[in-house]
Regions:
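Amphipathic alpha-helical segments
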Residues: 1-6, 10, 25-26, 166-204, ...
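Short, structured motif recognition centered on aromatic/hydrophobic residues
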Residues: 26-31, 35, 57, 90-91, ...
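Sequence-specific dsDNA recognition surfaces
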Residues: 34-48, 63-92
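Specificity-determining recognition surfaces
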Residues: 50, 138-167
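A short beta-sheet element
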Residues: 61-62, 76-140
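A short glycine-rich beta-alpha junction/loop motif
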Residues: 100, 114-121, 153-171
Length: 221
């Protein structure tokens, strides 16, 4: 059932954009035009264990980027590790795309300021153009496409590929409505994924209810 719900995610998003716009044209823009800044990070020298011992600075790796809100990291580093590497602080609410290996194409949102390694593309969204959660959902919807762009033995992508990715940019009011609906849908999906077996039937009924609400959503534009 969970796979069915996830497969419907992209269909819902595309259908909602069309329904909410009611036939209006929508511009597709590259992430490089939607972002204030797109950056990557770095890795402090692993040969200097002091950089990693008793650290307090969150340092994100791509295995922690998995279509999620990120409130903490498994590894912490110290300030000299930041200063002596390409690791850089990013503000909260960047949209992060994993660029390397098995995790390529996965996206997440950092909910606290943190640093990242070089395999993360960190998108600081210009919120005069787009809501960061809207950008997140657009990129999550393009996961298979982004993954297909990978090259080399590890199927990596790079910052230039990320900057050229295009997403539809409807008015901010429409973006807000889409985010509100997809946040509810995402919460439901997570509940199904994490629920005990005896709860699955109840969750399925809830899913069917929200599906009906989504398909009958009436927008005020």
């Amino acid at each position: 059932m969970l796979s069915t719900v996830k497969n419907l995610f992209g269909e819902f998003m595309n259908a909602m954009i069309k329904k909410l716009l009611q036939g209006q044209a929508v511009e597709w823009r590259a992430l490089g035009e939607v972002a204030k800044k797109i950056s990557s990070g770095g890795t402090p020298k692993t040969g200097i264990p002091e950089y990693y011992n008793n650290g307090e600075i969150p340092w994100l790796r791509t295995q922690e980027v998995n279509f999620n809100d990120i409130y903490d990291t498994g590894v912490k580093i110290i300030e000299p590790g930041v200063k002596n590497s390409s690791a850089r602080w990013i503000p909260a609410n960047c949209v992060i795309i994993a660029m390397y290996g098995a995790t390529v194409g996965r996206v997440g949102i950092n909910k606290i300021p943190m640093t990242t390694n070089q395999a993360c593309a960190n998108i600081e969204v210009n919120e005069e153009i787009a809501e960061y959660r809207y950008v997140y959902y657009c990129l999550a919807n393009q996961y298979e496409y982004i993954k297909s762009l990978g090259t080399g033995s590890q199927t990596n992508i790079n910052a230039q590929i990320v900057k050229k990715l295009k997403i539809p940019i409807p008015p901010l009011s429409i973006q807000s409505q889409i985010v509100a609906i997809l946040d509810t849908f995402d919460t439901l999906t997570q509940s199904i994924s994490e629920g005990l077996p005896k709860e699955i039937k109840l969750r399925q009924k809830q899913y069917e209810y929200y599906r009906e609400q989504l398909l009958n959503f009436k927008a005020t534009i």
